[in-house]
């Protein structure tokens, strides 16, 4: 009985030792056994390359196919939307902004673009030119300012003929002529101070007073000569 127990115990110890030697001493078998645990996407962290897992590759292929299908569907949608938008815009307004630019005009007719009624101004695009209401109003205002209104009392009685080289003839009122005749009766030659005083009183200038006295003296001399000849 004791011999049987001893043999069985010796067999167990041998099996355990062989198992330990297999797990810890055989390094190559251990690395091969745990090879899949240390591999990350086909790259072995220990320095060796391992093959990819077939399940991961299948999943990636399926994901790639779905992404491609989604991208192709999105591209088709955008193309269809752009085509529809361009057709509708061309049909409604008569020109295609995608092919000819936003400001291109159809050769068959003219286009008029008006802003909202609440807008400040309206624009018209006709024959390649812009016309705005603001510009028209500004031009009219400038013309009105450049041409001031002339009232009748602002006009002169005798217009000047400066283009002909002649000066305008001054017209005197009845009151002015009477005052000048009184002054000429007392004094036929005026000083400059007296001439300025009369000009201020009669609302005339010094030159007009001087010319009137010169003409009056010439007339007086002519009359005096005629009287002398008639007396002889």
Curated annotation (Swiss-Prot):
Residues 165-224 bind DNA. A motif (Antp-type hexapeptide) lies at residues 150-155. It is found in: Nucleus. InterPro entries: Antp_homeobox (IPR050296), HD (IPR001356), HD_metazoa (IPR020479), Homeobox_antennapedia (IPR017995), Homeobox_Antennapedia_CS (IPR001827), Homeobox_CS (IPR017970), Homeodomain-like_sf (IPR009057). It holds the Pfam family Homeodomain. Keywords: Developmental protein, DNA-binding, Homeobox, Nucleus, Transcription, Transcription regulation. The keyword Transcription regulation applies. CDD domains: homeodomain. SUPFAM superfamilies: Homeodomain-like. Residues 112-148 are annotated as: Disordered. Residues 135-148 have a biased composition (Low complexity). GO terms for molecular function: DNA-binding transcription factor activity, RNA polymerase II-specific; RNA polymerase II cis-regulatory region sequence-specific DNA binding. PROSITE patterns: ANTENNAPEDIA, HOMEOBOX_1, HOMEOBOX_2. SMART domains: HOX (SM00389). GO terms for cellular component: nucleus. It comes from the Eukaryota. GO terms for biological process: anterior/posterior pattern specification; regulation of transcription by RNA polymerase II. Sequence-specific transcription factor which is part of a developmental regulatory system that provides cells with specific positional identities on the anterior-posterior axis. Belongs to the Antp homeobox family. This is Homeobox protein Hox-C5a. It comes from Danio rerio.
């Amino acid at each position: 009985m004791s011999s049987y127990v001893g043999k069985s115990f010796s067999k167990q110890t041998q099996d355990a030792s062989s198992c330990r030697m297999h797990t810890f001493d055989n390094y190559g078998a251990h690395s091969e056994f745990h090879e899949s645990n240390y591999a990350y996407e086909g790259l072995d962290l220990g320095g060796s390359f391992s093959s990819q897992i077939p399940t991961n590759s299948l999943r990636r292929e399926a994901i790639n196919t779905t992404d491609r299908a989604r991208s192709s569907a999105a591209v088709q949608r955008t193309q269809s939307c752009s085509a529809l938008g361009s057709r509708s815009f061309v049909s409604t307004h008569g020109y295609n902004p995608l092919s000819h630019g936003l400001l291109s005009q159809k050769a068959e007719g003219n286009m008029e673009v008006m802003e909202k009624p609440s807008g400040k101004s309206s624009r018209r695009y006709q024959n390649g030119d812009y016309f705005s209401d603001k510009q028209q109003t500004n031009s009219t205002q400038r013309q009105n300012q450049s041409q001031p209104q002339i009232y009748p009392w602002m006009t002169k009685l005798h217009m000047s003929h400066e283009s002909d080289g002649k000066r305008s003839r001054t017209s005197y009122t009845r009151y002015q002529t009477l005052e000048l005749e009184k002054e000429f009766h007392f004094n036929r030659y005026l000083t400059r101070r007296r001439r300025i005083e009369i000009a201020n009183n009669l609302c005339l200038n010094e030159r007009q007073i001087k010319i009137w006295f010169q003409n009056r003296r010439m007339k007086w001399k002519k009359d005096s000569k005629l009287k002398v000849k008639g007396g002889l």
